[in-house]
């Protein structure tokens, strides 16, 4: 069965769906989540764990290239900066896999290649790494 996100064709609507999926999962894991008013800020959500706040930009992808999924970690102004966000939460829609990527590891990258089926892939340690939001 196809995951529901694959049926959403409009990119903005798909992004909103991914944000709701992120918020739902974070709440299930006992985080407090806040959603900023408006869409002009650099992050989509604020995750609170015992008073520690993390600014999270939610991204999603279903673009497969070779064995990996390509996910944008930038916006129309370029790569995100540690001044703007703390994490990119990337959802691979077909596999329903989350990556919690600290902004510090992304450098000036525009895209990341995520390979959930490979345990030794470049970003494997960030696959389902929700614990990073607890630090």
What are these regions (language model features)?
Residues 1-41, 46-135:
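Mixed-charge (Asp/Glu-Lys/Arg
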């Amino acid at each position: 069965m196809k995951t529901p996100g694959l049926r959403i064709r409009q990119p903005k609507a798909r992004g909103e769906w991914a944000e709701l999926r992120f918020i739902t999962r974070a709440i299930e894991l006992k985080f407090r989540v806040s959603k900023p008013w408006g869409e002009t800020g650099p992050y989509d959500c604020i995750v609170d764990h015992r008073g520690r706040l993390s600014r999270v930009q939610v991204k999603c992808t279903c673009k497969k290239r070779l064995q990996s999924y390509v996910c944008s970690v930038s916006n129309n102004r370029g790569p995100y900066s540690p001044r703007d966000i703390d994490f990119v939460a990337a959802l691979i829609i077909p596999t329903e896999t989350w990556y919690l990527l600290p902004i510090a590891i992304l450098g000036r990258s525009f895209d990341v290649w995520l390979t959930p089926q490979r345990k030794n892939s470049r970003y494997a340690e960030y696959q389902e790494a929700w614990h990073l939001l607890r630090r």
